[in-house]
Amino acid sequence: MKKLYFFVLISITLTHINAQTFSVSPSALIPDNTTTNYTMAVSGLPTQMNLANVGIEAAQINITHTKDVDLTITLISPGGKQIKLAQNNGGSGADFTNTFFYDTIPVNINEGIAPFNGSYAPYEALSSFNNLANPNGIWTLRIRDQTVTNTGTLNSWGIKFSNKPAGKVSFSSSNLPILIVNTGSLTIVGGTKITAMMSIIDQGFGIPNYITDIPNIYYGNIGIEIRGQSSTSFAQKQYGLETRDALGNNVNVSILGMPPENDWILYAPYNDKSLMRNVLAYNLARNMGRWASRCVFCELVINGIYQGVYVFQEKIKVDANRVNVTKLLPADTLGVNVTGGYIINIDKDPASWYSVVPPNNSTAGQKIRFTCNSPDTVDIMKKQRAYIKSYVDSFETALNGVNFMDPLIGYRKYASVTSFVDYFIVNELSKNVDGYRLSTYLHKDRITSGGQLKIGPVWDYNLAFNNANYCNGNLTTGWAYRFNPVCSGDTWQVPFWWDKLVTDSCFKNKLYCKYTQMRNSYLDTVNFFKEIDDNAALVNAAKDRHYKRYSILGTYVWPNPAPYAKTYAEENRNMKNWIKARLAWLDANILPYGVCNWITTGDNIDKNFSLLNVSAYPNPFTKAFVVSMKINKTSSYNIELYNINGQVIRQIKTDMLIPDEYNFYIDDVISIPTGIYLLRISAQDGSSKTIKLVKS
């Protein structure tokens, strides 16, 4: 039962424009096992709470109650924003006696001992209120008593507004790049980009940047919007932006050492208190030879207000320097042209189509949804959508079939095994609770460039590396891909793929090889922990400003697992301890179950050349055969089939291929005579391989 008490304003303390306190003294009952609202009117303030002029600085409560742990105390703004001041704190102790809440107090209410008197940091940061909302109107103090037998009294409560609002930070210089955004009178919203001006200052490593410096990296127009899904409720917002010219057209520019483009992300690591979980995952993928978003730590100012530490990074996009697949044009609807390139994703977005195979272990009829990302759902042509859907359907059907391990008709005909291996390692090391089922991207190039489905780029790892308190996301044991049996009722399930892949000897052997390679290099704990330490050193000064702006250390922010680190150093120490234990579990569960044969042919191919390994199968062939290539360098390739007279009877000229494994399917040879043939594969650097084939 919820009760409502409305009280007339008892007192107002006014000190010109510096501070204004509103308080009431209701002496009202706090009923047993009930949620009760107590309200207070606020008026006469400016119409926006912000960090520049006026905002909420503190809250105060005076409660008599025999058992504080029974209470959850929430402050609610006129616009409906809710902040928990206290939640089940104090154990069996009693009373909040003239208890004040300031974000700047080093001792959080979680750490206090009842009776609570004096000043504490609230359970959640008050600075979240200072988000341009109107402070005038009805404020609510909601008190939930969760048990029976213990009642109490709300004696008084109040709110202090001032020109020193919670979260206000004095900011003049940084060792990180400084981004300054000015929107004029416009408000940044989600879904539609507004026009703004952006300046970027970066004097180089080791040289301090001052907010008064002349912008030397970028100064010009942008379009900017709030982005994200669950993160939109956080005090620190994420932004997507486009660099534009004076006419509003997109313009490609190189920013902070990244290749020229116009689509960028300002990632806000609000609920990742290490500030670096995404950066770690993306760097891991790049060290495995995959493209992943390049990242630069920076500090952001919007309309004169300090916003904290951000990560400036590339957006996933078809581009020669990002997802390097052929850009699909509207006219590309037939033949080779329709075969690529595509980016699709598995996420919460409206589905372009659903998986033909339901997820394993789900209990509520959930379906895996695929969404067209590039071309997007608006721009993609019907024949293009039909093609990529049919291709993914064929991949799933082959993987789900009894012959799924067959190299010619199984899933390997459609998918790059090595890309799935690399993706598996990133997700399993990080125990990403969203892994495989959300923010999961796949891409496919044209058949002249390999044409297989590849998983990636990796994206969205803020809930990884022990940063989720649900569905076993915080455990160092267990497989992340086995999410469905743990949380079978969750709407967003993991595709069946991974349950099948881990039973395939080809996948297991490649996993063993790559994991062993990485554990002996980048994922050696000395090396990996050095990257964590280097990132921490880089943001060392900035993190103090960040956590003054967002007073959340030592508190719960969804979905942080307990215990909540009270310092930045403790957060990173906890993360490293977790990673060490996680690697030990993976060592015990990957290393015993694979065989690594780096070169499977007897060819004398120099590892410095492009071609590392080439094979063709089946041999003899009848209707078709597969050319499998493992390449070491970016190059284009000629694949030529000769008869015994030296005549070229079939030929494929590939586009530029990056280091990876590729399969090319030669399926137009059913009509050629039986006999002996020579297959020659050659690269730009002169390396080549010739294989004898027999047509039976």
Model-inferred region functions:
Residues 1-21, 602-603, 696:
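Bacterial Sec-dependent N-terminal signal peptides
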Residues 157, 161-420, 528, 541, ...:
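Phosphate-handling architecture centered on phosphoinositide signaling
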Residues 15-18, 607-617, 621-696:
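C-terminal outer-membrane/trafficking sorting elements
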Residues 69-71, 81-83, 196, 237-239, ...:
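Short beta-strand/loop motifs in extracellular/secreted proteins, especially
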Residues 174-177, 185-189, 193-197, 228-230, ...:
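Middle-to-C-terminal accessory/interaction subdomains
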Residues 73-75, 141, 159, 181, ...:
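Residue-level detector of buried hydrophobic side-chain packing
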Residues 20-23, 162-174, 592-610:
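Low-complexity, Pro/Thr/Ser/Gly/Ala-rich linker/spacer regions in secreted
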Residues 20-168:
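Loop and turn regions of beta-sandwich accessory domains that flank beta-strands and are enriched
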